[in-house]
């Protein structure tokens, strides 16, 4: 079994800038994705950690984002669906990140500065090399 721990800050991620803005931390699972009418849709769930007012403001701000199709939260737990236009670059990144051979050892942590920490494993080193290539 091969493992990889990386820290990234994705420019297309709708959560990163907001965690930095509201100084909250997300424990995040990207549950699934699908494609429809030239768009990529992402389904995610997670736990929001921080001061109550900041967590609420984070969710209210996120709900205003035009990319967000659905957002529901109860206390700290949330489920979200958001979309973005499909491009070749994003389609390739999605193919790599949603590889069914990847095992997420823990939730992706998006910290108060907007950085994501991923810890993943695979029986094939090449899978992790592809994940690592997403950083560049």
Residue ranges and their predicted role:
Residues 2-134:
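DNA-contacting interfaces and partner/effector-binding or oligomerization modules
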């Amino acid at each position: 079994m091969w493992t990889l721990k990386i820290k990234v800050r994705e420019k297309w991620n709708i959560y990163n800038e907001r965690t930095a803005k509201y100084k909250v931390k997300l424990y995040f699972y990207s549950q699934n994705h699908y494609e429809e009418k030239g768009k990529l849709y992402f389904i995610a769930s997670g736990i929001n950690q921080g001061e109550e007012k900041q967590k609420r403001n984070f969710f209210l701000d996120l709900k205003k984002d035009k990319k967000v199709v659905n957002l529901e939260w109860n206390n700290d737990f949330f489920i979200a669906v958001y979309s973005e236009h499909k491009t070749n670059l994003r389609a390739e990144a999605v193919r790599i990140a949603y590889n069914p051979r990847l095992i997420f050892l823990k939730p992706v942590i998006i910290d108060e500065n907007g950085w994501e920490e991923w810890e993943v494993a695979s029986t094939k080193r090449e899978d992790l090399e592809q994940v690592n290539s997403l950083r560049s």
